[in-house]
């Protein structure tokens, strides 16, 4: 725990100035996850929560779930939308928590003591922000949005070609994933993000923002 804190990864939930939950919130990667690298949805940066513990008197009050949800908020602020976690096969409480948070099972990993653990992953959806027009919101695109983005581009290819010269290089969902990958791999404060405009749950627009080049601040 001392090392967690020194690394800046130790987080707590407090009640009346008393620590009631502790866990590691890390973005440094987990080497054992390479054991199943082909079973994750992508190889972009991810959030991990380890060593989650709740004070005895606060158990069964949703404190662990609140910790996980707050960790998700930390991750969103960093523009990291992958969340991975693992637990022992006999940790029924953690398995129920993971299930309640809609994680997907990805495979089995082994730590140095050769104990098998179940590994899970979920995609965090960026928060949608209203734009002042009823029913319309905007949010950052994630890697998992490649399919709906490609579908929208393919339907409007002729219109897009006039101002998006590289549109004809996007011929498949894989091409769109390849386009999004380096954007989402870039630290949030340095990235040129792609945003999705939505009406209710339907995509109705895309916007690309260029911030990395001080001489070329523009919107597409």
Predicted regions and their residues:
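Hydrophobic adenine-recognition pocket in adenosine-nucleotide-binding enzymes
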Residues: 52-54, 87, 141
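C-terminal "cap" of GNAT-fold acetyltransferases
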Residues: 42-43, 101, 108-135
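Conserved active-site alpha-helix within GNAT-family acetyltransferase domains
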Residues: 65, 77, 89-107
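Acetyl-CoA-dependent GNAT
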Residues: 1-50, 55, 68-69, 111, ...
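Conserved acetyl-CoA-binding loop-helix of GNAT-fold acetyltransferases
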Residues: 54, 60-73, 96, 100
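Conserved GNAT acetyl-CoA-binding A-motif
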Residues: 68, 75-87
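Conserved beta-strand-loop-alpha-helix junction that forms the acyl-donor binding cleft
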Residues: 59, 85-95, 113
